[in-house]
Curated annotation (Swiss-Prot):
Top-level taxon of the source organism: Bacteria
Protein name: Bacilliredoxin SAR1592
One record GO biological process: cell redox homeostasis
Family per similarity comment: Belongs to the bacilliredoxin family.
InterPro entries: BrxB/BrxA
Species annotation: Staphylococcus aureus (strain MRSA252)
Amino acid sequence: MDMNFDLYMNGVVEQARNEIESAGYEQLTTAEDVDKVLKQDGTTLVMINSVCGCAGGIARPAASHALHYDVLPDRLVTVFAGQDKEATQRAREYFEGYAPSSPSFALVKDGNITEMIERHQIEGHDVMNVINQLQTLFNKYCEER
């Protein structure tokens, strides 16, 4: 690969990581990290991050803005598809019944998947639509803070 392309992609990945982390999501980079968090009681929103356009233009902004709400999950975490492969694979093992999809969101409660917002529910939609989908999940499975 061209060195300039590699440098460019490293910058894109770093920006995507920083954007979701600054919104309050914890980066999970190993299978052990994933198990430690997802096996806990309570609710966890998992954002499956990626470098595609709909992740940057829709999913990450929605992940951030959806948190301006009274009903929220207990924990916010992220795995990065294509980057943190071990962590992403382990997270997907919890998402039984759902095909691998990125970007996407999974709401896990007491170690079990409740529902997912998959790529096809993000791509081609606007940020507000995805925020509404997330907040609907929060209302259904989470408690007011």
